[in-house]
Amino acid sequence: MDSKQSSELVFTVRRQKPELIAPAKPTPREIKFLSDIDDQEGLRFQIPVIQFYHKDSSMGRKDPVKVIKKAIAETLVFYYPFAGRLREGNGRKLMVDCTGEGIMFVEADADVTLEQFGDELQPPFPCLEELLYDVPDSAGVLNCPLLLIQVTRLRCGGFIFALRLNHTMSDAPGLVQFMTAVGEMARGASAPSILPVWCRELLNARNPPQVTCTHHEYDEVRDTKGTIIPLDDMVHKSFFFGPSEVSALRRFVPHHLRKCSTFELLTAVLWRCRTMSLKPDPEEEVRALCIVNARSRFNPPLPTGYYGNAFAFPVAVTTAAKLSKNPLGYALELVKKTKSDVTEEYMKSVADLMVLKGRPHFTVVRTFLVSDVTRGGFGEVDFGWGKAVYGGPAKGGVGAIPGVASFYIPFKNKKGENGIVVPICLPGFAMETFVKELDGMLKVDAPLDNSNYAIIRPAL
């Protein structure tokens, strides 16, 4: 069941006045254009990340706020575009005005210990809005700070590092690269071990642009029957998939798909279960968008140090009836094929589509979007106090349309089992059904040919 300790936790945060942290040295004043993969409507939002750290006696009386502030300023010398502001040109083209103004920073103290958050840190986190304060007039896509960072000291000597990123600037690997650099500088490095590479022109549209692949992820879908997720009464819960849960789910995998990855399995199961919980019309189309990192799909691969967005949203499409009535293998095959669609040509085709179609938003009507950050490295970021107890997305359901996106986050439960935790955001009525369907499939005596089940239990 859900952890009650952290969900009912109440505490007070005292914040200092927000300030701007500029690069520690003068940086170039120039205009740098985003790529046509960065520059799409579906990335024009802020994404929250949170990291929890224990007290480390070897750090003595060092103040994490002061250490991290200094490290950010030093890191921005290398990542100076983050200290600028986004502007919009002709054709809605985004560019960074490298003004050197700096990123937004908040210093805070909380009258709570890390232990009070519970022994299994996972989204949703209590009082997130206090740990990552939405500084007034700071959250716009244009003419606003591109990063907001809050460091909150805890009563026990630990601290919380929370960050909000303008997603048009970077994807998860790019953000982790920046955070890792801040950690290295905080530990005394004179330069990041991986130097940042801009080169956004590598993911620009061709001249002339030519869409050569099918991109149903950008279809214009009308919400004819009011099936966009209602934004009121949204419920956030996290679900843990450890070895026993994954093993239980694999019982439903047909023999010819037995080598499927855990990502493919979970995506098929969650998509199916989520669709049944929302109860769309049987003949309506439903979609699963799988974020695929395309860095290695290029020949040659994108350069080491590239920190822009370099992923695609390949999509699996079927009807609600086919998804719910067919065995799990049906959804699994759709997901497997979708992942394999992403090639260098596919990425070039997406960039061309952005220019030709006016930078459209990916389809959100009856859509489930999943992003795997299990190898993202958030938890490895070390500012001198060791690795994070928890590091990764602060909540699920983020984006322009809440409730669409979920993340696969590496997690160790209190039994010491390594697994994946998945934050899910659904309306209250749907969450009840979702949990019921999940429980059903995990039962030892669950009927293997029953297509009406799809999966897992809330994280303990």
From Swiss-Prot:
Coiled coil: none annotated. The active site is at 167 (proton acceptor), 382 (proton acceptor). Its EC number is 2.3.1.196. Pfam families: Transferase. One of its GO terms (molecular function) is acyltransferase activity, transferring groups other than amino-acyl groups. InterPro entries: CAT-like_dom_sf, Plant_acyltransferase. Keywords: Acyltransferase, Transferase. Induction: Up-regulated in the leaf during the hypersensitive reaction provoked by a pathogen infection. The keyword Ion transport does not apply. Belongs to the plant acyltransferase family. Probably involved in the formation of volatile ester benzylbenzoate. This is Benzyl alcohol O-benzoyltransferase. It comes from Nicotiana tabacum (Common tobacco). The lineage of its organism: Eukaryota, Viridiplantae, Streptophyta, Embryophyta, Tracheophyta.
